[in-house]
Amino acid sequence: MNKDQQLAHHILDAVGGIDNVDNIIHCMTRVRLKINNETQVDYPKLKNIEGVLGVIQDERLQIVVGPGTVNEVSAEMVKLSGVQLGEDIPHRSNTSNIKNQAQQNKREFQQKRKQSKMNTILKSIANIFIPLIPAFIGAGLIGGIAAVLNNFITAGTISADWVKQLVAVLNVIKDGMLAYLAIFTGFNAAKVFGATPGLGGVIGGTTLLTGITEDNPIKNVFTGEPLIAGQGGIIGVILAVWLLSIIEKKLHKIVPNAIDIIVTPTISLLIIGLLTIFFFMPIAGFISDGLVGVVNWVIGVGGIFSGFIIGAFFLPLVMLGLHHIFTPIHIELINQSGATYLLPIAAMAGAGQVGAALALWVRCKNNTTLRTAIKGALPVGFLGIGEPLIYGVTLPLGRPFITACLGGGIGGAVIGGIGHIGATAIGPSGISLLPLIAHQKYLGYIIGLLSAYLAGFIFTYFFGTTKEMRNLNKLGD
């Protein structure tokens, strides 16, 4: 049994065993467990397991273990559960326990009452896009490599025909994700809203207006102008699939079982398909145009001030899980402007974390527990994966989290002051974002990164530590 498999067993032991887990999923850094009985979870024990970088209590219990490790840990848990990743785990011990089920239903009802509509919306957005993040990263970096090679070709540094062919091939691979993002979004949105995923994918594909030409366009019913493929972007897709889920569920209730498989999907697609083309695409197009205009105005006019605010407050948004609201905004910015000028500023938040961690490493030489945590979390922090540093280092200590935010604010102010530094895709951050910087503004982005590193280091070195942190061999209070 390797180290990651052992970690999976230790985590399961702390949460009450596999019999106390109803469902297992994961994202880039977190194992997300749906717990049957929260009273059986030993949180102090869970947080002190070597390899656990943080624990977040939410609708699902989220255990931060870091990139790469999360795949191995989740795979071992799934192996022990006997089901596939994401499937509900059957439990022989409680299938007939009506009392436990009633208590669970009561907890879920109370939890739903506590959740605001905004929290529900944010969680839905997160659940739609989190599974797509690896594809965003892979396709984005491949597109970045193609862009760098194309710049060399344009500059005359490279002229070989095979390089031109390679650039074309890399762009085809990149567009396998980005060109059909509406379909992927529709598919995932259907899963989140409880509709048939395939139908959601079809609705997403409808927005691409396949087969429509300039000679025979579909007119916008509100303006009379021709609709443009992808108009309304993913905002329109999400709204349309949400309505699809309502229509499909209603039809399942009223259509006889004998013809349900034929009638329900046909009527659902016909109704929502027409509404998507003639209503959702124009309306969502208006919304997305306004949203993009506002964001570009805030960044363009606010400059240094806007950059500081975004860079400084992005980490608290990540901590609260509210940062996912920016995902559709990034995508709309890329669709309309060719780049998102918001992402490089937000990326400075992670750079401030890196600077803070380096300062803690230097200042807290006697705190081997803290230095061990930094050693494990810092390398991926440079690459833009900040959760291990947030939940494993700065947030438990308190004060360094604040100084890291200030460092991110300085980096954001620098990016905002330079201006027009955008990214052509989303997903990566930190150094990993460098190949995706638009219009060859690499130097400006590097200056911003270095500024955030330095500011995070200075703020934390002078104001972010206490005597206890420096001398005691522990992490947090």
Curated annotation (Swiss-Prot):
Q: Does the keyword Transmembrane helix apply?
A: yes
Annotated coiled-coil segments of the chain: none
Keywords carried by this UniProt record = Cell membrane, Kinase, Membrane, Phosphotransferase system, Sugar transport, Transferase, Transmembrane, Transmembrane helix, Transport
Could you tell me which residue ranges the PTS EIIB type-1 domain spans? 5-87
- Say yes or no: keyword Transferase present: yes
Q: Which residues cross the membrane?
A: 128-148, 167-187, 192-212, 227-247, 267-287, 298-318, 342-362, 377-397, 401-421, 443-463
Q: Where is this region: Disordered?
A: 91-113
Regions of biased composition (Polar residues) lie at: 92-104
Q: Which InterPro entries match?
A: Glu_permease_IIB, PTrfase_EIIB_Cys, PTS_EIIC, PTS_EIIC_1, PTS_IIB_1, PTS_Sugar-Specific_Components
Biological process (GO) annotations held by this record are: peptidoglycan turnover; phosphoenolpyruvate-dependent sugar phosphotransferase system
Any single Pfam family the record assigns to this protein: PTS_EIIC
Output the superkingdom of the source species. Bacteria
How does the UniProt record describe the way this protein sits in the membrane? Multi-pass membrane protein
Q: Which GO terms describe its molecular function?
A: kinase activity; protein-N(PI)-phosphohistidine-sugar phosphotransferase activity; protein-phosphocysteine-N-acetylmuramate phosphotransferase system transporter activity
Which cellular components does GO assign to this protein? plasma membrane
Record EC number? 2.7.1.-
Domain PTS EIIC type-1 intervals: 123-477
**Any idea where this protein resides?**
Cell membrane
Catalytic residues at: C27
Main enzyme class? transferase
What does it catalyze? N-acetyl-beta-D-muramate-(1->4)-N-acetyl-D-glucosamine(out) + N(pros)-phospho-L-histidyl-[protein] = 6-phospho-N-acetyl-beta-D-muramate-(1->4)-N-acetyl-D-glucosamine(in) + L-histidyl-[protein]
Per the record, the pathway is: Cell wall biogenesis; peptidoglycan recycling
Quoted from the entry, the domain comment is: The EIIB domain is phosphorylated by phospho-EIIA on a cysteinyl or histidyl residue, depending on the transported sugar. Then, it transfers the phosphoryl group to the sugar substrate concomitantly with the sugar uptake processed by the EIIC domain. The EIIC domain forms the PTS system translocation channel and contains the specific substrate-binding site.
According to its UniProt entry, the function of this protein is described as: The phosphoenolpyruvate-dependent sugar phosphotransferase system (sugar PTS), a major carbohydrate active transport system, catalyzes the phosphorylation of incoming sugar substrates concomitantly with their translocation across the cell membrane. This system is involved in the uptake and phosphorylation of MurNAc-GlcNAc, the principle peptidoglycan turnover product of S.aureus, yielding cytoplasmic MurNAc 6P-GlcNAc.
Q: What is this protein called?
A: PTS system MurNAc-GlcNAc-specific EIIBC component
Q: Write the lineage as a comma-separated list.
A: Bacteria, Bacillati, Bacillota, Bacilli, Bacillales
